[in-house]
Amino acid sequence: MSHKPAHLLLVDDDPGLLKLLGLRLTSEGYSVVTAESGAEGLRVLNREKVDLVISDLRMDEMDGMQLFAEIQKVQPGMPVIILTAHGSIPDAVAATQQGVFSFLTKPVDKDALYQAIDDALEQSAPATDERWREAIVTRSPLMLRLLEQARLVAQSDVSVLINGQSGTGKEIFAQAIHNASPRNSKPFIAINCGALPEQLLESELFGHARGAFTGAVSNREGLFQAAEGGTLFLDEIGDMPAPLQVKLLRVLQERKVRPLGSNRDIDINVRIISATHRDLPKAMARGEFREDLYYRLNVVSLKIPALAERTEDIPLLANHLLRQAAERHKPFVRAFSTDAMKRLMTASWPGNVRQLVNVIEQCVALTSSPVISDALVEQALEGENTALPTFVEARNQFELNYLRKLLQITKGNVTHAARMAGRNRTEFYKLLSRHELDANDFKE
């Protein structure tokens, strides 16, 4: 059974039953926090964002109905499910009349409980449509604030620059902004500006006329035209070659695009969202990124936190990704062991969510058990240390190694090294600056 990601508060003064129910719900993909009294449950609600409360009825000091009454004072819309071993039909009727969402008798049928949870979450969902952000699984206050900013920004057409480390989900975030915008019925088109050679990138963005270059056998519209009325997402904008930065600036200023080999301008109507993992102000200081283009793109800046900055999302994400991977490959896989989840929580995650996806895919591929073990997670994390980099990361590493080799061969002679690389001195110095290399370090 597949469930929407949700954060549940379980309240019961029986630690054994509390633990058992918590494990069962965690294995179903829910994020769970527990409390052994009504007072403790209220403290949890004060410090955490909870989607649903499940409480035992009979508890010392504050019973389930008293807890429900207190919850309604501070969070009136919070759905509450009451569990009891001593229930009766009049009790259930009275509870639901007071606003309790569901009143279930112990021992609780698991399917009835899961259905009650899903129904409660569905009914308590905000009136506004939240499907725009359904691909972003989070309960982190950092991310929730960022999503609220994104929702507000989406209503206008201002350019947005998304900053964040590789693997944090910048494209998914850009897609969410598009989904929340008035342009959501039009195309969302993404391109990685660092993954293509300059001429090919120019042709992809602006299109080309027949005969514009060898192989251009027909007219072809570019992505600016393909995204007409919608959103164009320029990923890794910091890696865009300087000549194309000039052309992009002109397009943004004039709202017109001229295909390669054409003398005709075409009006465009697109919203621009860009993203980078680079420090663009530093790139501007080194002369690698145009200041005027930066301010055109950076009307609103959003920074996605690294996964290590929102560890509270790891159980939620891990269970969500496990369900997806299991559905595709091994439906019998159900959960992580306690130690496996602890290891996921304490890992450093330099590759962020992308790395977490890879680790979980590997765990599901290799497990023969319904429960992912700690040893399997450890193995997958160690394997990630030798995992293939992305294309852009691999290209950057190649450039760095290549430049070092050139400078070693030429003993730091930039003129000679640039000639060997087939670049002029200005371009070569920019390459050295991008990779923070100093030719003087290679002179004998």
UniProtKB/Swiss-Prot annotation:
Sites where the protein binds ATP: 164-171, 227-236
Principal place of residence: cytoplasm
Knockout consequences: Mutants show decreased amounts of glmY.
Cellular compartments per GO CC: cytoplasm; protein-DNA complex
UniProt-listed CDD domains: AAA
Regions crossing the membrane: none
UniProtKB keywords: ATP-binding, Cytoplasm, DNA-binding, Nucleotide-binding, Phosphoprotein, Transcription, Transcription regulation, Two-component regulatory system
Any one Pfam family match given in the protein's UniProt record, by short name: Response_reg
Domain Response regulatory residue range list: 7-121
DNA-binding annotation, residue ranges on this chain: 414-433
SMART domains reported for this sequence: AAA (SM00382), REC (SM00448)
4-aspartylphosphate PTM sites in chain numbering: D56
GO biological process: DNA-templated transcription; phosphorelay signal transduction system; positive regulation of DNA-templated transcription
Note: Not required for the regulation of the glmY-glmZ-glmS regulatory cascade by glucosamine-6-phosphate depletion.
UniProt function note: Member of the two-component regulatory system GlrR/GlrK that up-regulates transcription of the glmY sRNA when cells enter the stationary growth phase. Regulates glmY transcription by binding to three conserved sites in the purL-glmY intergenic region.
Protein name: Transcriptional regulatory protein GlrR
Organism: Escherichia coli (strain K12)
